[in-house]
Amino acid sequence: MSGKGVDIEHWSRIAAEWTAWARAPNHDAFWAYRASLLAFIGQGAGEALDVGCGEGRVSRLLKDCGYRVTAVDPVSQLISAAERAGSADAYMIAAAADLPFKNCSFDLAVAYNVLMDVEDIPAALKEVRRVLRPSGTFVISIVHPFADRGHFAGTEANAPFVLQRSYFGRERFEGTEVRNGLQMDFAGWSQPLESYMTALESAQLVVTSLREPVPDTSDKASYMERWSRVPLFLWLKARLLPI
């Protein structure tokens, strides 16, 4: 996770909770999208930066893709958890908006479901641009802004998706989920797609690929079936615009 102030405080408080939640196989949405995410990133080589690595599961995926991975997160407890699991090749405690690396250090940067926890997204994206090499790629996953503002009207797989409040504006969200004996307290920022695109424009990053992935529900919990009708995530690839 990555951010400052309220975001670091939140993730520091629930670091152990998140580590248990994220590492339970097939427990949350990540597992239903993992194969598609691996294919979207693609096999590669060189230096990869996992921005807001959390407990390290995306770092481990990047290693599976063939990269040498540097994992960063502003929450020391999460960096420790990632390191204990051997998730990456190098680890640093750092926020997305203040990366301790030289210019043009990485071939790939990934921010997986991190930008919702960043208070200053434009500053974070400008930092990522700075540390990417000119030929580098930036992979972003966010909770789909549309999914963020609505909810399903019931628990059944075909329950209608309802949007009752405005899609626009920036809002703080907080909520608790309990599943299979595990509890997770989520918090972050909800904002429309335009906010992310404006931040990319200001960082002079151009989107080259966009996906609204569909979950693999073949062996996952039935609660994921509904997300085959409404996109839960939005994935982007961005490249540097020449200055």
Per-range role (PLM):
Residues 108-121:
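A short SAM/SAH-binding and catalytic strip from SAM-dependent methyltransferases
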Residues 49-51, 55-98:
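Class I SAM-dependent methyltransferase SAM/SAH-binding core
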Residues 187-210:
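Short alpha-helix
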Residues 97-108:
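A short acidic, Gly/Pro-enriched loop at the edge of an enzyme's catalytic core
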